Amino acid sequence: MAIERELVLVVDFGGQYNQLIARRVREHNVYCEIIPYTTSVEDIKKKNPKAIIFTGGPNSVYGEGTPRVEKEIFELGVPVLGICYGHQLTAYTLGGKVESPDIREYGKTEVKIDNKSPLFDGIKEADQSWMSHTDYVSEIPEGFKIIATTDQCPVAAMANEEKKIYGVQFHPEVEHTLFGQKMLGNFLFKVAGLKADWSMASFAEEKIKAIKELVGDKKVLCALSGGVDSSVAAVLVHKAIGKQLTCVFVDHGLLRKDEGDQVEAIFKKQFDMNLIRVNAGERFLGKLKGVSDPETKRKIIGEEFIRVFEEEAGKLGQIDFLVQGTIYPDVVESGTNTSATIKSHHNVGGLPEDMQFSLIEPLRELFKDEVRAVGEELGIPHKLVWRQPFPGPGLAIRVLGEITEEKLEITREADAIFREEIALAGLEEKIWQYFACLPNIQSVGVMGDERTYCHTIALRAVTSSDAMTSDWARIPYEVLDKVSRRIVNEVKGVNRIVYDVTSKPPATIEWE
Protein backbone atom coordinates (compact mmCIF):
# COMPACT_ATOMS: atom_id res chain seq x y z
CA MET A 1 0.00 0.00 0.00
CA ALA A 2 2.98 2.31 -0.53
CA ILE A 3 2.15 5.68 -2.06
CA GLU A 4 4.78 7.48 -4.17
CA ARG A 5 5.69 10.94 -2.91
CA GLU A 6 8.80 13.01 -2.19
CA LEU A 7 10.46 11.81 1.01
CA VAL A 8 12.56 13.41 3.74
CA LEU A 9 14.34 11.03 6.12
CA VAL A 10 14.78 12.03 9.77
CA VAL A 11 17.68 9.99 11.20
CA ASP A 12 17.05 9.25 14.88
CA PHE A 13 19.96 9.66 17.30
CA GLY A 14 17.83 9.44 20.44
CA GLY A 15 16.95 13.10 20.95
CA GLN A 16 13.83 14.10 22.86
CA TYR A 17 12.48 16.23 19.99
CA ASN A 18 12.79 13.70 17.15
CA GLN A 19 9.08 13.23 16.51
CA LEU A 20 8.64 16.99 16.74
CA ILE A 21 11.14 17.43 13.89
CA ALA A 22 9.08 15.06 11.74
CA ARG A 23 5.86 16.89 12.60
CA ARG A 24 7.41 20.26 11.73
CA VAL A 25 8.47 18.92 8.32
CA ARG A 26 4.95 17.63 7.68
CA GLU A 27 3.49 21.00 8.65
CA HIS A 28 5.20 22.22 5.48
CA ASN A 29 3.15 19.59 3.55
CA VAL A 30 6.25 17.49 2.98
CA TYR A 31 6.21 13.77 3.82
CA CYS A 32 8.93 12.42 6.09
CA GLU A 33 9.81 9.25 7.98
CA ILE A 34 11.95 8.63 11.06
CA ILE A 35 14.62 5.93 10.70
CA PRO A 36 17.20 4.63 13.22
CA TYR A 37 20.80 5.83 12.84
CA THR A 38 21.82 2.20 12.24
CA THR A 39 20.12 2.24 8.82
CA SER A 40 22.75 1.49 6.16
CA VAL A 41 23.57 3.86 3.32
CA GLU A 42 22.36 1.18 0.89
CA ASP A 43 18.95 1.06 2.57
CA ILE A 44 18.79 4.85 2.60
CA LYS A 45 19.53 4.92 -1.16
CA LYS A 46 16.66 2.47 -1.77
CA LYS A 47 14.25 4.91 -0.11
CA ASN A 48 15.36 7.65 -2.55
CA PRO A 49 15.11 10.58 -0.09
CA LYS A 50 15.13 14.15 -1.38
CA ALA A 51 16.61 15.44 1.91
CA ILE A 52 18.02 14.01 5.16
CA ILE A 53 17.83 15.50 8.66
CA PHE A 54 20.02 14.30 11.55
CA THR A 55 18.35 14.74 14.95
CA GLY A 56 19.78 15.67 18.31
CA GLY A 57 20.81 13.09 20.87
CA PRO A 58 22.23 12.67 24.38
CA ASN A 59 25.69 11.43 23.35
CA SER A 60 29.11 12.98 22.71
CA VAL A 61 30.53 12.32 19.24
CA TYR A 62 33.91 11.34 20.67
CA GLY A 63 32.47 8.89 23.24
CA GLU A 64 33.05 5.14 22.99
CA GLY A 65 30.18 3.31 21.26
CA THR A 66 28.47 6.60 20.41
CA PRO A 67 25.99 6.69 17.48
CA ARG A 68 27.65 7.27 14.13
CA VAL A 69 26.72 7.36 10.43
CA GLU A 70 28.66 6.09 7.43
CA LYS A 71 30.65 8.88 5.77
CA GLU A 72 29.16 7.82 2.44
CA ILE A 73 25.82 9.32 3.45
CA PHE A 74 27.34 12.74 2.69
CA GLU A 75 28.32 11.55 -0.80
CA LEU A 76 24.80 10.67 -1.96
CA GLY A 77 24.21 14.14 -3.37
CA VAL A 78 21.21 14.53 -1.04
CA PRO A 79 20.91 17.74 1.04
CA VAL A 80 21.66 17.13 4.74
CA LEU A 81 20.70 19.19 7.80
CA GLY A 82 22.26 18.25 11.14
CA ILE A 83 20.55 19.49 14.32
CA CYS A 84 22.41 19.72 17.68
CA TYR A 85 24.12 16.29 17.99
CA GLY A 86 23.49 15.85 14.26
CA HIS A 87 25.37 19.13 13.66
CA GLN A 88 28.31 17.97 15.79
CA LEU A 89 28.33 14.54 14.13
CA THR A 90 28.40 16.13 10.67
CA ALA A 91 31.41 18.26 11.62
CA TYR A 92 33.21 15.36 13.34
CA THR A 93 32.60 12.87 10.50
CA LEU A 94 33.82 15.30 7.83
CA GLY A 95 37.04 16.28 9.62
CA GLY A 96 36.00 19.10 11.92
CA LYS A 97 36.61 19.30 15.67
CA VAL A 98 34.12 18.97 18.55
CA GLU A 99 34.97 19.97 22.13
CA SER A 100 33.35 20.22 25.55
CA PRO A 101 33.34 23.88 26.70
CA ASP A 102 33.66 25.34 30.20
CA ILE A 103 30.30 27.11 29.83
CA ARG A 104 27.28 25.24 28.48
CA GLU A 105 24.25 26.64 26.68
CA TYR A 106 20.70 25.81 27.71
CA GLY A 107 17.49 27.67 26.97
CA LYS A 108 16.72 30.84 25.03
CA THR A 109 19.80 32.25 23.30
CA GLU A 110 20.28 35.09 20.84
CA VAL A 111 21.92 33.89 17.64
CA LYS A 112 23.66 36.12 15.08
CA ILE A 113 22.84 34.99 11.56
CA ASP A 114 24.32 35.32 8.08
CA ASN A 115 21.05 35.72 6.21
CA LYS A 116 22.78 35.65 2.84
CA SER A 117 22.85 31.87 3.26
CA PRO A 118 19.86 30.10 1.62
CA LEU A 119 19.18 28.40 4.96
CA PHE A 120 18.52 31.76 6.63
CA ASP A 121 16.95 33.60 3.71
CA GLY A 122 14.38 36.13 4.94
CA ILE A 123 15.40 35.73 8.60
CA LYS A 124 16.59 38.59 10.84
CA GLU A 125 20.34 39.00 11.46
CA ALA A 126 19.79 38.42 15.19
CA ASP A 127 16.95 36.34 16.63
CA GLN A 128 16.02 34.02 19.48
CA SER A 129 16.99 30.34 19.33
CA TRP A 130 16.70 27.42 21.76
CA MET A 131 19.97 25.78 22.81
CA SER A 132 20.41 22.53 24.73
CA HIS A 133 23.97 21.25 24.41
CA THR A 134 27.16 20.48 26.31
CA ASP A 135 29.58 19.96 23.38
CA TYR A 136 30.15 22.36 20.49
CA VAL A 137 31.88 22.50 17.11
CA SER A 138 35.19 24.33 17.60
CA GLU A 139 36.59 23.81 14.08
CA ILE A 140 34.53 23.38 10.92
CA PRO A 141 35.40 20.82 8.22
CA GLU A 142 37.12 21.82 4.99
CA GLY A 143 34.72 23.35 2.47
CA PHE A 144 32.38 24.70 5.18
CA LYS A 145 31.76 28.24 6.40
CA ILE A 146 30.25 29.59 9.61
CA ILE A 147 26.77 31.06 9.05
CA ALA A 148 25.64 31.71 12.66
CA THR A 149 27.23 32.34 16.07
CA THR A 150 26.24 33.03 19.68
CA ASP A 151 28.25 34.55 22.53
CA GLN A 152 29.16 31.06 23.80
CA CYS A 153 29.08 29.06 20.55
CA PRO A 154 31.46 30.07 17.73
CA VAL A 155 29.75 27.69 15.27
CA ALA A 156 26.01 27.96 15.93
CA ALA A 157 25.48 27.01 12.27
CA MET A 158 27.72 25.95 9.39
CA ALA A 159 27.25 25.30 5.68
CA ASN A 160 28.86 23.64 2.71
CA GLU A 161 26.57 25.31 0.21
CA GLU A 162 28.09 23.59 -2.81
CA LYS A 163 27.25 20.12 -1.40
CA LYS A 164 24.09 21.38 0.38
CA ILE A 165 25.24 20.12 3.79
CA TYR A 166 24.21 22.21 6.79
CA GLY A 167 24.46 21.98 10.56
CA VAL A 168 22.79 24.02 13.32
CA GLN A 169 23.58 23.77 17.03
CA PHE A 170 20.18 25.11 18.12
CA HIS A 171 16.78 23.37 17.84
CA PRO A 172 14.70 24.86 14.99
CA GLU A 173 11.86 22.43 15.71
CA VAL A 174 10.88 23.93 19.09
CA GLU A 175 8.65 27.00 19.35
CA HIS A 176 11.27 28.92 21.37
CA THR A 177 13.41 29.20 18.22
CA LEU A 178 11.35 31.99 16.73
CA PHE A 179 12.60 31.54 13.17
CA GLY A 180 12.70 27.72 13.31
CA GLN A 181 9.82 26.91 10.96
CA LYS A 182 10.98 29.52 8.46
CA MET A 183 14.47 28.00 8.52
CA LEU A 184 13.15 24.44 8.06
CA GLY A 185 11.04 25.68 5.15
CA ASN A 186 14.15 27.24 3.59
CA PHE A 187 15.98 23.91 3.89
CA LEU A 188 13.11 21.95 2.37
CA PHE A 189 12.22 24.29 -0.49
CA LYS A 190 15.17 26.62 -1.22
CA VAL A 191 17.98 24.12 -0.52
CA ALA A 192 16.40 20.72 -1.31
CA GLY A 193 13.92 21.99 -3.93
CA LEU A 194 11.04 19.92 -2.58
CA LYS A 195 7.39 20.26 -3.60
CA ALA A 196 4.65 20.48 -0.96
CA ASP A 197 2.85 17.31 -2.11
CA TRP A 198 1.64 15.90 1.23
CA SER A 199 -1.97 16.69 2.21
CA MET A 200 -4.65 14.78 4.06
CA ALA A 201 -7.10 15.07 1.15
CA SER A 202 -4.64 13.43 -1.25
CA PHE A 203 -3.63 10.90 1.43
CA ALA A 204 -7.24 9.76 1.95
CA GLU A 205 -7.90 9.51 -1.79
CA GLU A 206 -4.71 7.53 -2.47
CA LYS A 207 -5.16 5.27 0.56
CA ILE A 208 -8.76 4.36 -0.39
CA LYS A 209 -7.55 3.40 -3.88
CA ALA A 210 -4.67 1.34 -2.45
CA ILE A 211 -6.96 -0.52 0.00
CA LYS A 212 -9.38 -1.39 -2.84
CA GLU A 213 -6.52 -2.87 -4.87
CA LEU A 214 -5.07 -4.76 -1.90
CA VAL A 215 -8.32 -6.30 -0.63
CA GLY A 216 -10.06 -7.14 -3.89
CA ASP A 217 -13.17 -9.18 -3.03
CA LYS A 218 -11.88 -10.52 0.31
CA LYS A 219 -13.31 -9.94 3.80
CA VAL A 220 -11.89 -7.52 6.35
CA LEU A 221 -12.37 -7.28 10.12
CA CYS A 222 -11.81 -4.21 12.31
CA ALA A 223 -11.58 -3.96 16.09
CA LEU A 224 -13.48 -0.73 16.72
CA SER A 225 -13.02 1.04 20.06
CA GLY A 226 -14.80 4.30 19.25
CA GLY A 227 -11.58 6.24 19.77
CA VAL A 228 -10.31 8.62 17.10
CA ASP A 229 -7.70 6.29 15.59
CA SER A 230 -9.82 3.14 15.18
CA SER A 231 -12.82 5.23 14.04
CA VAL A 232 -10.89 6.99 11.27
CA ALA A 233 -9.24 3.71 10.23
CA ALA A 234 -12.65 1.98 10.04
CA VAL A 235 -14.29 4.75 7.99
CA LEU A 236 -11.31 4.94 5.62
CA VAL A 237 -11.46 1.18 4.95
CA HIS A 238 -15.28 1.26 4.71
CA LYS A 239 -15.06 4.00 2.06
CA ALA A 240 -12.83 1.64 0.07
CA ILE A 241 -14.66 -1.69 0.38
CA GLY A 242 -18.09 -1.04 1.93
CA LYS A 243 -19.88 -4.15 3.25
CA GLN A 244 -16.78 -6.33 2.91
CA LEU A 245 -15.76 -4.75 6.23
CA THR A 246 -17.16 -6.00 9.54
CA CYS A 247 -16.41 -4.03 12.71
CA VAL A 248 -16.40 -5.71 16.11
CA PHE A 249 -16.93 -3.33 19.02
CA VAL A 250 -15.96 -5.02 22.29
CA ASP A 251 -17.68 -3.11 25.10
CA HIS A 252 -15.54 -4.14 28.06
CA GLY A 253 -17.63 -2.20 30.56
CA LEU A 254 -14.79 0.28 31.10
CA LEU A 255 -16.03 3.04 28.78
CA ARG A 256 -17.06 6.61 29.57
CA LYS A 257 -20.68 7.54 30.17
CA ASP A 258 -22.99 6.55 27.25
CA GLU A 259 -19.96 5.93 25.02
CA GLY A 260 -20.98 2.45 23.88
CA ASP A 261 -24.39 3.66 22.69
CA GLN A 262 -22.82 6.63 20.88
CA VAL A 263 -20.37 4.39 19.01
CA GLU A 264 -23.16 2.05 17.95
CA ALA A 265 -25.36 4.93 16.75
CA ILE A 266 -22.63 6.62 14.68
CA PHE A 267 -21.21 3.57 12.91
CA LYS A 268 -24.32 1.44 12.53
CA LYS A 269 -26.83 4.13 11.68
CA GLN A 270 -24.87 7.06 10.22
CA PHE A 271 -22.22 5.09 8.29
CA ASP A 272 -24.34 1.95 7.72
CA MET A 273 -21.46 -0.36 8.69
CA ASN A 274 -21.64 -4.03 9.56
CA LEU A 275 -21.15 -3.59 13.32
CA ILE A 276 -21.20 -6.27 16.00
CA ARG A 277 -21.36 -4.97 19.57
CA VAL A 278 -20.21 -7.43 22.22
CA ASN A 279 -21.29 -6.53 25.76
CA ALA A 280 -18.54 -8.18 27.79
CA GLY A 281 -18.46 -5.96 30.89
CA GLU A 282 -19.14 -8.74 33.41
CA ARG A 283 -16.49 -10.95 31.83
CA PHE A 284 -13.79 -8.25 32.05
CA LEU A 285 -14.70 -7.21 35.60
CA GLY A 286 -14.52 -10.85 36.67
CA LYS A 287 -10.98 -11.16 35.29
CA LEU A 288 -9.95 -7.88 37.00
CA LYS A 289 -11.32 -8.80 40.42
CA GLY A 290 -8.68 -8.28 43.13
CA VAL A 291 -6.13 -6.80 40.67
CA SER A 292 -4.61 -3.42 41.57
CA ASP A 293 -1.28 -3.28 39.67
CA PRO A 294 -1.71 -1.08 36.55
CA GLU A 295 0.50 -3.11 34.21
CA THR A 296 -1.28 -6.31 35.24
CA LYS A 297 -4.61 -4.61 34.51
CA ARG A 298 -3.39 -3.58 31.05
CA LYS A 299 -2.19 -7.08 30.22
CA ILE A 300 -5.39 -8.78 31.47
CA ILE A 301 -7.55 -6.39 29.44
CA GLY A 302 -5.36 -6.77 26.34
CA GLU A 303 -5.39 -10.58 26.54
CA GLU A 304 -9.12 -10.80 27.27
CA PHE A 305 -9.87 -8.34 24.46
CA ILE A 306 -8.04 -10.61 22.02
CA ARG A 307 -9.93 -13.68 23.29
CA VAL A 308 -13.33 -11.99 22.90
CA PHE A 309 -12.34 -10.62 19.51
CA GLU A 310 -11.13 -14.04 18.29
CA GLU A 311 -14.37 -15.68 19.44
CA GLU A 312 -16.42 -13.19 17.43
CA ALA A 313 -14.11 -13.45 14.42
CA GLY A 314 -14.51 -17.23 14.51
CA LYS A 315 -18.26 -16.85 13.98
CA LEU A 316 -17.75 -14.88 10.76
CA GLY A 317 -16.08 -17.53 8.63
CA GLN A 318 -13.06 -16.77 6.46
CA ILE A 319 -11.51 -13.36 7.24
CA ASP A 320 -8.42 -12.30 5.30
CA PHE A 321 -7.47 -8.90 6.72
CA LEU A 322 -7.50 -7.18 10.11
CA VAL A 323 -7.65 -3.37 10.42
CA GLN A 324 -5.70 -1.71 13.23
CA GLY A 325 -5.69 2.00 14.13
CA THR A 326 -1.92 2.09 14.62
CA ILE A 327 -0.52 5.62 14.19
CA TYR A 328 3.02 6.84 13.55
CA PRO A 329 4.09 7.54 17.16
CA ASP A 330 3.18 3.91 17.99
CA VAL A 331 5.40 2.71 15.15
CA VAL A 332 8.33 4.94 16.12
CA GLU A 333 8.17 4.17 19.85
CA SER A 334 7.97 0.42 19.30
CA GLY A 335 10.47 0.29 16.45
CA THR A 336 13.60 2.27 17.38
CA ASN A 337 16.57 1.35 19.53
CA THR A 338 16.79 4.78 21.09
CA SER A 339 13.74 4.97 23.35
CA ALA A 340 12.67 3.02 26.41
CA THR A 341 9.23 1.49 26.99
CA ILE A 342 7.30 3.66 29.47
CA LYS A 343 3.99 1.78 29.35
CA SER A 344 2.95 -1.15 27.20
CA HIS A 345 0.94 -0.03 24.16
CA HIS A 346 -2.52 -1.59 23.96
CA ASN A 347 -2.51 -1.34 20.16
CA VAL A 348 1.03 -2.37 19.19
CA GLY A 349 2.08 -5.94 19.84
CA GLY A 350 -0.22 -8.09 21.94
CA LEU A 351 -1.60 -9.85 18.87
CA PRO A 352 -1.23 -13.64 18.82
CA GLU A 353 1.83 -14.91 16.95
CA ASP A 354 -0.23 -17.43 14.99
CA MET A 355 -2.68 -14.77 13.81
CA GLN A 356 -4.25 -15.82 10.50
CA PHE A 357 -5.03 -12.30 9.25
CA SER A 358 -2.90 -9.94 7.19
CA LEU A 359 -2.76 -6.50 8.82
CA ILE A 360 -4.12 -3.30 7.27
CA GLU A 361 -2.82 -0.27 9.18
CA PRO A 362 -4.01 2.66 7.04
CA LEU A 363 -2.93 5.35 9.53
CA ARG A 364 0.51 4.06 10.44
CA GLU A 365 2.17 6.99 8.62
CA LEU A 366 0.19 9.70 10.45
CA PHE A 367 0.54 11.75 13.62
CA LYS A 368 -2.59 12.33 15.72
CA ASP A 369 -3.30 15.81 14.31
CA GLU A 370 -3.09 14.34 10.79
CA VAL A 371 -5.47 11.52 11.77
CA ARG A 372 -8.00 14.13 12.89
CA ALA A 373 -7.58 16.00 9.60
CA VAL A 374 -8.25 12.80 7.63
CA GLY A 375 -11.33 12.18 9.79
CA GLU A 376 -12.67 15.62 8.86
CA GLU A 377 -11.96 14.90 5.16
CA LEU A 378 -13.97 11.65 5.43
CA GLY A 379 -16.99 13.40 6.93
CA ILE A 380 -16.76 11.87 10.40
CA PRO A 381 -18.70 14.02 12.91
CA HIS A 382 -16.55 16.82 14.30
CA LYS A 383 -17.37 15.75 17.87
CA LEU A 384 -16.01 12.25 17.24
CA VAL A 385 -12.91 13.45 15.41
CA TRP A 386 -12.08 15.69 18.39
CA ARG A 387 -13.02 13.08 20.98
CA GLN A 388 -10.67 12.99 23.92
CA PRO A 389 -7.79 10.49 23.71
CA PHE A 390 -8.90 7.44 25.68
CA PRO A 391 -6.63 4.53 26.61
CA GLY A 392 -7.44 1.01 25.38
CA PRO A 393 -7.86 -0.28 28.96
CA GLY A 394 -10.40 2.50 29.51
CA LEU A 395 -11.46 3.48 33.02
CA ALA A 396 -9.51 0.51 34.42
CA ILE A 397 -6.46 2.76 34.58
CA ARG A 398 -8.41 5.80 35.77
CA VAL A 399 -9.71 3.88 38.76
CA LEU A 400 -6.53 3.42 40.76
CA GLY A 401 -6.25 0.20 42.72
CA GLU A 402 -8.86 -2.54 42.54
CA ILE A 403 -11.81 -1.95 40.19
CA THR A 404 -15.43 -2.27 41.27
CA GLU A 405 -18.67 -1.35 39.52
CA GLU A 406 -19.29 1.32 42.18
CA LYS A 407 -15.90 2.96 41.56
CA LEU A 408 -16.44 2.85 37.80
CA GLU A 409 -19.82 4.56 38.14
CA ILE A 410 -18.36 7.31 40.37
CA THR A 411 -15.56 7.93 37.85
CA ARG A 412 -17.97 7.92 34.88
CA GLU A 413 -20.30 10.47 36.44
CA ALA A 414 -17.48 12.78 37.61
CA ASP A 415 -15.79 12.58 34.21
CA ALA A 416 -19.06 13.36 32.39
CA ILE A 417 -19.55 16.50 34.51
CA PHE A 418 -15.96 17.64 33.88
CA ARG A 419 -16.31 17.12 30.11
CA GLU A 420 -19.68 18.86 30.03
CA GLU A 421 -18.38 21.97 31.81
CA ILE A 422 -15.25 22.12 29.63
CA ALA A 423 -17.54 22.09 26.57
CA LEU A 424 -19.83 24.78 28.02
CA ALA A 425 -16.77 26.97 28.68
CA GLY A 426 -15.69 26.62 25.01
CA LEU A 427 -12.42 24.91 25.96
CA GLU A 428 -12.95 21.54 24.22
CA GLU A 429 -10.44 22.09 21.41
CA LYS A 430 -8.05 24.24 23.42
CA ILE A 431 -7.10 21.43 25.81
CA TRP A 432 -5.40 18.32 24.44
CA GLN A 433 -6.82 15.94 27.04
CA TYR A 434 -8.94 16.23 30.17
CA PHE A 435 -10.54 13.64 32.43
CA ALA A 436 -11.48 12.69 35.97
CA CYS A 437 -9.82 9.79 37.74
CA LEU A 438 -10.36 8.08 41.07
CA PRO A 439 -7.21 7.83 43.18
CA ASN A 440 -7.31 5.14 45.82
CA ILE A 441 -7.83 7.83 48.48
CA GLN A 442 -10.62 8.61 50.92
CA SER A 443 -10.69 11.67 53.12
CA VAL A 444 -12.72 13.27 55.89
CA GLY A 445 -15.31 15.92 55.02
CA VAL A 446 -18.43 17.61 56.35
CA MET A 447 -21.67 17.50 54.36
CA GLY A 448 -24.68 19.06 56.04
CA ASP A 449 -24.07 18.54 59.74
CA GLU A 450 -22.49 15.13 59.31
CA ARG A 451 -18.90 13.92 59.11
CA THR A 452 -18.15 12.04 55.88
CA TYR A 453 -15.34 9.73 54.83
CA CYS A 454 -15.58 9.54 51.04
CA HIS A 455 -13.68 9.25 47.78
CA THR A 456 -11.43 11.94 46.28
CA ILE A 457 -11.71 12.76 42.56
CA ALA A 458 -8.61 14.03 40.74
CA LEU A 459 -9.07 16.22 37.66
CA ARG A 460 -6.36 16.11 34.98
CA ALA A 461 -6.16 18.47 31.99
CA VAL A 462 -3.13 19.03 29.77
CA THR A 463 -2.07 21.07 26.76
CA SER A 464 0.08 19.38 24.12
CA SER A 465 0.51 19.01 20.38
CA ASP A 466 1.52 15.35 20.25
CA ALA A 467 1.32 13.84 23.79
CA MET A 468 5.10 13.32 23.84
CA THR A 469 5.37 16.25 26.26
CA SER A 470 2.56 18.20 27.91
CA ASP A 471 1.85 20.98 30.38
CA TRP A 472 -1.05 21.24 32.81
CA ALA A 473 -3.90 23.33 31.44
CA ARG A 474 -4.60 26.71 33.06
CA ILE A 475 -8.37 26.24 33.29
CA PRO A 476 -10.12 29.36 34.66
CA TYR A 477 -10.82 29.13 38.39
CA GLU A 478 -14.53 29.74 37.89
CA VAL A 479 -14.76 26.66 35.62
CA LEU A 480 -12.88 24.49 38.12
CA ASP A 481 -15.07 25.84 40.90
CA LYS A 482 -18.25 24.89 39.04
CA VAL A 483 -16.91 21.42 38.21
CA SER A 484 -15.94 20.85 41.83
CA ARG A 485 -19.30 21.95 43.22
CA ARG A 486 -21.25 19.88 40.71
CA ILE A 487 -19.28 16.67 41.31
CA VAL A 488 -19.54 16.92 45.10
CA ASN A 489 -23.27 17.65 44.89
CA GLU A 490 -24.24 15.26 42.09
CA VAL A 491 -21.94 12.25 42.50
CA LYS A 492 -22.67 10.13 45.54
CA GLY A 493 -19.63 9.04 47.54
CA VAL A 494 -17.32 11.99 46.68
CA ASN A 495 -16.39 14.78 49.10
CA ARG A 496 -13.12 16.19 47.73
CA ILE A 497 -11.80 17.36 44.33
CA VAL A 498 -8.11 17.96 43.52
CA TYR A 499 -6.52 19.34 40.33
CA ASP A 500 -3.29 17.81 38.97
CA VAL A 501 -0.71 20.52 38.12
CA THR A 502 2.14 18.27 36.94
CA SER A 503 3.68 18.46 33.46
CA LYS A 504 4.96 15.54 31.35
CA PRO A 505 7.75 14.83 32.13
CA PRO A 506 8.09 14.09 35.03
CA ALA A 507 4.54 12.67 35.16
CA THR A 508 2.71 10.81 32.40
CA ILE A 509 -0.67 12.14 31.26
CA GLU A 510 -2.58 9.16 32.66
CA TRP A 511 -2.18 8.34 36.34
CA GLU A 512 -1.64 4.64 35.64
Swiss-Prot record:
Domain Glutamine amidotransferase type-1: 7-197
Coiled-coil segments on the chain, per record: none
Record domain GMPS ATP-PPase: where: 198-387
This protein's GO CC annotations: cytosol
Amino acids binding ATP: S225, G226, G227, V228, D229, S230, S231
Active site: C84 (nucleophile), H171, E173
Pathway: Purine metabolism; GMP biosynthesis; GMP from XMP (L-Gln route): step 1/1
InterPro entries referenced in this protein's UniProt entry, alphabetically: Class_I_gatase-like, GATASE, GMP_synth_C, GMP_synth_GATase, GMP_synthase, GMPS_ATP_PPase_dom, Rossmann-like_a/b/a_fold
Reactions that this protein is recorded to catalyse: XMP + L-glutamine + ATP + H2O = GMP + L-glutamate + AMP + diphosphate + 2 H(+)
Enzymatic class: ligase
Keywords from the named record: ATP-binding, Glutamine amidotransferase, GMP biosynthesis, Ligase, Nucleotide-binding, Purine biosynthesis
GO molecular function, one term: GMP synthase activity
Superkingdom of origin: Bacteria
Keyword Repeat assigned: no
CDD domains, sorted: GATase1_GMP_Synthase, GMP_synthase_C
EC identifiers of the protein: 6.3.5.2
General function of this protein: Catalyzes the synthesis of GMP from XMP.
Subunit record text: Homodimer.
Name under which the protein is recorded: GMP synthase [glutamine-hydrolyzing]
Organism field: Clostridium novyi (strain NT)
Chain's gene name: guaA
